[in-house]
Amino acid sequence: MNLKDPICAIATPPGKGAIGVVRLSGEGALEIAARVWRGKDPRRLKGGRFALGEVVDPKTGEAIDQAILLVFRAPRSYTGEDLVEFQTHGSPAVLRRVMEVLVAEGARPAGRGEFTFRAYLNGKMDLAQAEAVLALIEAEGELARRQALRALEGALSRRIEALENRLLNLLAHIQALLDYPEEGVEPLEAERTIREVLAEVEALLAQAKASRLAQKGARLALIGAPNAGKSSLLNALLGYERALVSPIPGTTRDYLEAPLELFGIPLVAVDTAGVRETEDPVERMGVERALGIAEEADLVLYVVDRSQPKPAPPPLPWARTLKVATKSDLPPAWEDPEFLPVSSLTGEGLDRLKEAVREALLGREGGEVLLTERQVEALLRARERLEEALSLPEDLMGLALEEAARALALLTGKEVAEEVVARVFQNFCVGK
């Protein structure tokens, strides 16, 4: 693949729309654009300027559509190359035809993520920022959007670069001590530096779960005895009536799912059948399914009616379970500080419960860092090498520190295999 030749792609989603965008980038992009454009010559436009005209078939002179043409000149463009965008009406037929004439004039259809790949190769962004582009495109919740934008703006890259520089400075100092002991080079507190870098790596890894949940979403299971108030609590969390509520125990015989966003996290809240001992085979199936849902959930709300005697707890994954005492507006039959009191009727305790859900899913840091699986692997490798370095004397820790610095460099793509880069960009859409 020639990474200088002109490429083109439809940059807007498939289907009909008010506006469609076709991108053209690479050597000769302005010349190709001039041949398919009737209006002000794109070659005469300054970067960041636009013109109104028509996209035409240069072989027949036939107009394809009225359009706006935008010119971005190298290196001040997304790709770092000369780049042209045609903004047409969002008709699939129009967009296909524009692509046809561009290809006929010498451009080739872009591969997946090739525009962003060229931006990476031309130094417009590092690999962590390129991954942030994809995360921003795919973001479904507000937290994922914030994470991706911060990474795209370089927040993670700057943090990693600072750690990498600390290790490289330490390596240089250790090497100077070994090579020129007679010069009296001041010894550096290597252990303290390594522990500080290790603490930063640990802090990043602590946010890996939050990053995954922000990007992929989480499942929240409501588990409890019949008539414990699970359906009412679900409706209160949603802010509208989704689940059927009845004073008759056992109203919910199967599970019910509803989408919910809390603190920017896309959740699927699952209201389950009441968990109790029963001879009814249908209800028993519902109970078994409820317990299975709890095992697979990212977080469980164990819901108990505080106005009634406390039941024996069911088998639940307690490490990721919050205990909720419902009907707190009624006189209590028991008190337990491990339970969060909530009234679905008055709303008392709902904000505290939501905050507890946020902290259980995201931790105290709040999950503002975007980390991909590839980046987490690199951080784990860096942590392993830093821990190894701590167990070695100064004159032997150099190799472990070099490998730790190299692992950190993988995050931003400074030292990364070609196949890894290809794997990152194969998940992109064609027009990006």
From Swiss-Prot:
It is an enzyme of class 3 (hydrolase). It is found in: Cytoplasm. The keyword Repeat does not apply. (6S)-5-formyl-5,6,7,8-tetrahydrofolate binds at R23, E85, K124, K432. It comes from the Bacteria. Residues 217-362 form the TrmE-type G domain. K(+) binds at N227, S246, I248, T251. GTP binds at residues 227-232, 246-252, 271-274. Binds 1 potassium ion per subunit. GO terms for molecular function: GTP binding; GTPase activity; metal ion binding. GO terms for biological process: tRNA methylation; tRNA wobble uridine modification. Its EC number is 3.6.-.-. Its cofactor is K(+). Its main location: cytoplasm. Mg(2+) binds at S231, T252. One of its GO terms (cellular component) is cytosol. Keywords: Cytoplasm, GTP-binding, Hydrolase, Magnesium, Metal-binding, Nucleotide-binding, Potassium, tRNA processing. Homodimer. Heterotetramer of two MnmE and two MnmG subunits. Belongs to the TRAFAC class TrmE-Era-EngA-EngB-Septin-like GTPase superfamily. TrmE GTPase family. Exhibits a very high intrinsic GTPase hydrolysis rate. Involved in the addition of a carboxymethylaminomethyl (cmnm) group at the wobble position (U34) of certain tRNAs, forming tRNA-cmnm(5)s(2)U34. This is tRNA modification GTPase MnmE. The gene is mnmE.
